[in-house]
Amino acid sequence: QLSKQRKSDVMILVLAEAARNINIAAVRMRKHPNLEYIIVLGAHVEGTRLTKALLERTRRALQYLEENPETKAVLSGGKGDGESITEAQAMCNYLVEHGIDRERLILEEKSTNTTENLKFSLGMIGLNHSVGIVTNNFHVFRGTAIGKKCGCREIYPIPSRYRSWRLLIYIPREILAIIKDKLMGNM
């Protein structure tokens, strides 16, 4: 029988290996130009300000939209506790301030989690389009898998970087979310 310390050590090794695999998968993603839509998954907003995770996602969306002028973006995220505006509106404000035409932006402002982000966003645009999922590198596997489960036939990951000590929190949380979503049939 394993001691508590040994079990803890094994769990840390499993989480570290899973985190490494998630990041390797994100780094190896190919470029997918000229998609019809990208869906930018929301993350917490502090008042009206983009948090680091959401800022990185929004910057990646900006880069993609600048490189692909025919692509439209669905900005997905409702208004949570402590948020003065929806996550979608915060992303929209940033993108418009940085030169993206408002006509290219579609706001999905009711979702409260990743599954809702994708269900509601795909419900707005339909399932028969080429779609990129813009989210942080540690979150791209789950976001893309949920999009496929929602019925999107042509879906591609578009990871944004995220470098912070908070990865020590986010990656184990993401691994648990993957397990939960798999068990609940969301993936």
For the regions a language model picked out, list residue spans one by one.
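Hydrophobic alpha-helical topogenic segments used for membrane insertion/localization
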Residues: 9-19
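A transmembrane-helix-recognition feature enriched in membrane-embedded lipid enzymes
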Residues: 167-187
